[in-house]
Amino acid sequence: MSRKDLANAIRALSMDAVQKANSGHPGAPMGMADIAEVLWNDFLKHNPTDPTWYDRDRFILSNGHASMLLYSLLHLTGYDLPLEELKNFRQLHSKTPGHPEIGYTPGVETTTGPLGQGLANAVGLAIAERTLAAQFNQPDHEIVDHFTYVFMGDGCLMEGISHEVCSLAGTLGLGKLIGFYDHNGISIDGETEGWFTDDTAKRFEAYHWHVIHEIDGHDPQAVKEAILEAQSVKDKPSLIICRTVIGFGSPNKAGKEEAHGAPLGEEEVALARQKLGWHHPPFEIPKEIYHAWDAREKGEKAQQSWNEKFAAYKKAHPQLAEEFTRRMSGGLPKDWEKTTQKYINELQANPAKIATRKASQNTLNAYGPMLPELLGGSADLAPSNLTIWKGSVSLKEDPAGNYIHYGVREFGMTAIANGIAHHGGFVPYTATFLMFVEYARNAARMAALMKARQIMVYTHDSIGLGEDGPTHQAVEQLASLRLTPNFSTWRPCDQVEAAVGWKLAVERHNGPTALILSRQNLAQVERTPDQVKEIARGGYVLKDSGGKPDIILIATGSEMEITLQAAEKLAGEGRNVRVVSLPSTDIFDAQDEEYRESVLPSNVAARVAVEAGIADYWYKYVGLKGAIVGMTGYGESAPADKLFPFFGFTAENIVAKAHKVLGVKGA
């Protein structure tokens, strides 16, 4: 039995699964099988019986369409992925979806498919490994020591995100990040030389990567020597450029775009079996090949060795060991609830008129000392986003730091933070202007899809940004985030709601939270202790006239002040007015029906929503009989205090809308 036989097991399973599903991508798994065989059998440190072992190597398949490569590897090495699951490739409720998805399949470290983002996740994983090692490793006690390996294709390197993240990886000198470039020269449209003629080696050398120039990706010895060389380079990430043939083994489709994204066809699969010397029926793997691939015994020994290291570490450094375990398990500090609630109550008792971006920074200063797991950063807007707090230390200055200067890389930043979140041991936060979530949008969506624990700080949230004008003024962005499944948003109206938003964002384990913050100063509102508690429910009654409301005014963020002014005017007319603060629509929507009804009673149809964002979103709360004071187009370049009245954000306009809803004559 040869190494080719072991690699051919991957090729056969990949061909068979794609053929049975009548859907999928056989070419890349067949082309990268030899590389994967060497990496997984000779180098990868992992334990199939415990896929979450803290010190395992991380393997990322950035070209996620090649998912059958990964599923074949997981099945062959002994993960809980039986053959039946491979037969159900791309079928409903299988553990083998079309693209790898974290949480579905044991051993899958991240969800990949949108090209280039797996590479970004890998950079995040490598950052997390190095930072965690610097924070916890002690002389003679190295408990964090693993590599991050990432497979990528031509498409990954064409995507702009690859530039963002590989540039940063080189700047940070991530020596334990090793990339494998599947240079097969084929994409969906055909031979890439018509649209991708970059000198990839020079490109990555310019990023300060160690580049191992083109090796034969079908020569196991060349692959092995390249990996050994890459592992020996400690101060730079490494890229191994592997010349491969897409659809390797297919007599008529190898090296052609026909092998990329469609089944080979039964006749071609049979011919490929003959050419590869694989004389076994579909989905049949000989016992001796299973035995050669089985990584369970080796993995259990590796983990047991680490367990012994950790036991010695725990004996020598009990407090560090306890903290390491807490952070890797995602737990919160012991005094978290008591300390955060005390801070929130103190804010309410000491009113301040400040921007919510400043309130966010103040909250970081209050919560940060309790949370060494915070690993923050901004896309070159730290002085504006106010994401640097008194305990921030740049990773560039200190490997054990807690702050990343991401540069102008919004997309890369967000996807890197997803990788940091997946690694464990950290709660990443990222920041930019709300408008520039547009650059980061797909990574933000992926965070929600993957249930990544990332906090996104988006400041300058509206026309309140002012003079920079409509290119920088967010209008539809918040509504877009609110409409994203499993994406939590907070638009606080003052420092108290901002502190509650940060608290719940840190506590959320199953998805991202965006904090939508103002540039301009906002007045603090009065609250009772019960109202302070109800902020955490996403929406609550902030002001009430008593009795059944004649009209309900709903507001968020910077528009709360004028809404309260409008309520005073309406109350002066003898009307019962209720003001509802709705900083988090998703959290409010998740409350029980009784609570939601107590805040927004269904028998009160007269409602006006006020928010300096796109108006359409608010019809779900005001109904077709209600009114909205919101944006219906883009902003303008002018001082903020001129823009708000120009676009109708005044107490007088809210009153006028209320009159119309109430049917006041002449309104």
Curated annotation (Swiss-Prot):
Record-linked PROSITE patterns: TRANSKETOLASE_1, TRANSKETOLASE_2
Catalytic activity: D-sedoheptulose 7-phosphate + D-glyceraldehyde 3-phosphate = aldehydo-D-ribose 5-phosphate + D-xylulose 5-phosphate
Residue pairs linked by disulfide bridges in the UniProt entry: none
Alphabetized Pfam families for the sequence: Transket_pyr (PF02779), Transketolase_C_1 (PF22613), Transketolase_N (PF00456)
Entry GO MF terms: metal ion binding; transketolase activity
One GO cellular component term: cytosol
Gene3D superfamilies in alphabetical order: 3.40.50.920, 3.40.50.970
Keyword Acetylation: yes
N6-acetyllysine modifications at: K342
Cofactor(s) listed in the protein's UniProt record: Mg(2+); Ca(2+); Mn(2+); Co(2+)
Matching InterPro entries: THDP-binding, Transketo_C/PFOR_II, Transketolase-like_C_2, Transketolase-like_Pyr-bd, Transketolase_bac-like, Transketolase_BS, Transketolase_CS, Transketolase_fam
Binding-site positions, thiamine diphosphate: H65, G113, P114, L115, G155, N184, H260, F436
Important for catalytic activity (site feature) positions: H25, H260
SUPFAM superfamilies: Thiamin diphosphate-binding fold (THDP-binding) (SSF52518), TK C-terminal domain-like (SSF52922)
Cofactor note: Binds 1 Mg(2+) ion per subunit. Can also utilize other divalent metal cations, such as Ca(2+), Mn(2+) and Co(2+).
Residues the record lists as binding Mg(2+): D154, N184, I186
Keywords noted in UniProt: Acetylation, Calcium, Magnesium, Metal-binding, Thiamine pyrophosphate, Transferase
PANTHER family to which the protein is assigned, alphabetical: TRANSKETOLASE, TRANSKETOLASE 2
NCBIfam families: tktlase_bact
Family named by the database record: Belongs to the transketolase family.
Protein name: Transketolase 2
